[in-house]
Amino acid sequence: MASSASRFIKCVTVGDGAVGKTCMLICYTSNKFPTDYIPTVFDNFSANVVVDSTTVNLGLWDTAGQEDYNRLRPLSYRGADVFVLAFSLVSRASYENIMKKWIPELQHYAPGVPIVLVGTKLDLREDKHYLLDHPGMIPVTTAQGEELRKQIGAAYYIECSSKTQQNVKGVFDAAIKVVIQPPTKQREKKKKKSRQGCSMMNMFRGRKMSCFKS
């Protein structure tokens, strides 16, 4: 058990400002929705977490999505094991910025790090009062979120609500799983590269043998 607990996973949340990243982190770590003061950035948090009988030390890093933090934000990416990339289900602009802004930024500063795509504020997507107060706003559908996951190559797509706590734990369970149990495609790629390496070695060996024979 001690050796399992020593496995450290750095999880960094990324996405536009005001999509609910900080609320999601507070909800996950305190099991309650913040109703008073909500900080711009959540303090770094670390705790032992058990997922699928495996204990890991999960470190959570929050980032500010506003342009004012564009220079400082990438400093948090160093050493990241997984990114939780969030957009609001009731903000199409934040959804579109996943491809426009966040994927290019992550590919530049942290290429190859797995991503869990998250649609936040799930409770508001079906809230009739909220929709009436925001005429013309078209929520992001589950199908559109799943399509975006495929486009960016994210390991998971999860919709959650910090206010109701729906699926919040599932977001970070998925982030842990993608590190300790990489998706099948990633494992297959590694095996394929290994097989290709072996076949190349065998090919070179064959050429050497034929040279010696002649």
From Swiss-Prot:
Organism: Oryza sativa subsp. japonica (Rice)
Posttranslational mods: May be palmitoylated.
Name the record gives this protein: Rac-like GTP-binding protein 3
PROSITE patterns per record: RHO (PS51420)
Gene: RAC3
Xref: SMART domains: RAB (SM00175), RAS (SM00173), RHO (SM00174)
Function: Inactive GDP-bound Rho GTPases reside in the cytosol, are found in a complex with Rho GDP-dissociation inhibitors (Rho GDIs), and are released from the GDI protein in order to translocate to membranes upon activation.
Positions in coiled-coil regions: none
UniProt-annotated location(s): Cytoplasm; Membrane
GO BP terms, alphabetized: actin filament organization; cortical cytoskeleton organization; establishment or maintenance of cell polarity; regulation of actin cytoskeleton organization; regulation of cell shape; signal transduction; small GTPase-mediated signal transduction
Keyword Membrane among UniProt keywords: yes
Segments passing through the bilayer: none
